Each structure stands twice: as C-alpha cells, then as structure tokens.
Amino acid sequence: SSDLPPLEADLGYEGARRLWDGMLWAAGEMRELPQRHGFDCDYRVGHLWTAILPRRVGLLYDWQAEANRRWGYEGLRFVAKDELPEWIASERYLAGLYDPHAAHLNPLKLAFGLAAAIERAGGRIHERTRALNYREEGDGYRVRTEHGEIRCAALVLACNAYIDGLDSELSQRMLPVGTYQVATEPLGEERAKSLLPRNCCVTDNQFVLDYFRLTPDHRLLFGGGCTYLGGMPSDIRAATRPYLERVFPQLRGVALEYAWGGHIDCSMRRTPDIGRQGNRYWLQGYSGHGVLPSLAAARAVSDALLGDDETLALYQRLRNPKFPGGQRFAAPLEALGKAYYRLRDLF
C-alpha cells in the first residue's frame, strides 16, 4: 500500500527489506493458493505501469534501476513510446514499465475460493453478523453482535474502511475513500485483444490514477476517480465513462453493463497500520492495494498468534498518525489535497 521510502525512513533499509521480502512471499503464495485449494480466480501474469506526463517518465527509469540495485527485483522492462502499441491501443501514454512478476486477478472469486477452503478446513464463517462493540473481559474479549455475543481469547480487527465506531482509536487513523469501477459489455475476443494485446493489467503513475484490465469474457474492467467526502457518485457509469473514453476513445459510447463501488482504507502516510495491544490485533491501512499486503499482514498476525511476533513488531514501528480533527475534518482536508494533486496531474 506504500512506496518503499516511508518504510525505509521508519525501519531503516534492513527493516524495509524484510517487509519487501514478505511482499515477495505473498506474491508467490497468491500464485499458489488457487492451485493448492482448487479454485479459479482468473489469475493472469503481467502489469504495465505507465507515465502520462514527461516529467514522470523518469520515475519509471528510477524504479527499474532501484528495484534491481537495492531490492534485488530483476526483470522489469522499460517500454518506450514507439513500443507501446504492442501493449496498449492508446495514445495517452508516453512510456511504460512492464513487470513480468506482477499479476492481476478477480478478488471476488479469490474471496469465495478462500472462504470455501477455510470451511473445508473446519473454519466457521458467520456472514451478516455485524459486531457492535467489544470489551476486555478476564483473559479475553467479549464481542457483542446483532445476533448474540462471542467470547474469545484473542481479537483480530480486520475491518479496513468499515471499522466505523467499533474502535474509535483505529478509525481515527483511517479515512474511507470511495472508489468505483465499471465493466463494459462483452467486446468480443478480437476487439478486446486489440485494446491490450498482451493481456496485462495497466495503471498509470498519476496521483489520481486509472487502472484497467480485460476479463476472461472479453470485457474491459476500468476504474478511475475517487471520492473523499463520503458516499458514491449517484451514477457511477456517468462518473467513470469520461476516464475510460479518455484512455480508449475508440470505445466511445460502449455499453457499460456493470458498475459498482465501495470504500478503501487510506492511512495518512499510505503505510499499512498493523499491530497489537495485548491480545487485540488489527490490520488496516492498505490504501487501495490490499490483495498482496493483506496476505503479508495476515501472515505476520498469524505468526504472532502462534508466538512469533518479530514481523508484527516491524509493522508496528511504522508511524500511522491520526488524521487532524478525526474523520469529520480529515475528509475535507484530503479533498483539498486531492484537488492540489489533480492539478499537478495536468502538467
């Protein structure tokens, strides 16, 4: 959820390197999970990180060099503008950096696959059982839900943007940011492949970024824009279409069959907020990049529950301050900040 400089500033190179290595483990684990547990989540390899502004092309070069030299991450390929048509049918981009180790997947299918694996292993999942509050009691915790109470020796809070009033301290360190996506009608194999010939997922390095990929049934799934002041656009299709058609003008007027949205949990420094206090654990602050960081964080918390809290202690050294004035004032401040960076995205 974070670039490496904030991690290195808090933990030093060795500490940041350990968290980086944990992310590499998570990437390998994510590749193996569907095979190990027998489910499909549309896992596909390949990510193209693009630059729109001339001054941001250098960021691609810089990361390619730093990844190899400092973090041992090899294989990144710089894609010059004259090569981009082999990757993406858009004139919007000046250059790209291809990562053959990165991947994209369907997170809903991943969630269903993992849930089924948990139940096969004897785990129990209670859906639609909202936790209202909790308190310490004896050597454990008592959690009050809408349908009854639960007693437990250890409590893990993994609520992300939906922590709300369940834990006021944690909620003050998070800002729920609305994000939304659309999926086009099926484009047909030939037309879909013409948009992204190598079937990689694409993001750009703007502050307010676009991100998109193809689906197995030849739709374009596209996200762009966000809201800091709560809620969702009244018409997600209308809000997202200009971003999509800016990238792919050849899709102007295409039917958008699906539209949905939700909230991501942004921390002030965009660093993950993971830690413990006694037998109360928490995982949050993925800031829009939760698939791999949440797996790495879950491993750290699982290890701590089993007696090894070394990695969790590293995470807990990351500084995650409260938003000034709490969420009431954080959203307007973040919206102002977003407006500033959106202006910077133009030049």
Language model: regions and residue ranges:
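Dinucleotide-binding Rossmann-like beta1-alpha1 core, especially the glycine-rich loop
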Residues: 1-81
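Generic structural signal for well-ordered, non-membrane alpha-helical segments
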Residues: 16-19, 23-27, 56-60, 103, ...
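Active-site substrate-recognition segment that forms the wall
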Residues: 28, 36-44, 131-133, 149-278
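General beta-strand structural signal in soluble alpha/beta enzymes
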Residues: 77-80, 125-127, 145, 157, ...
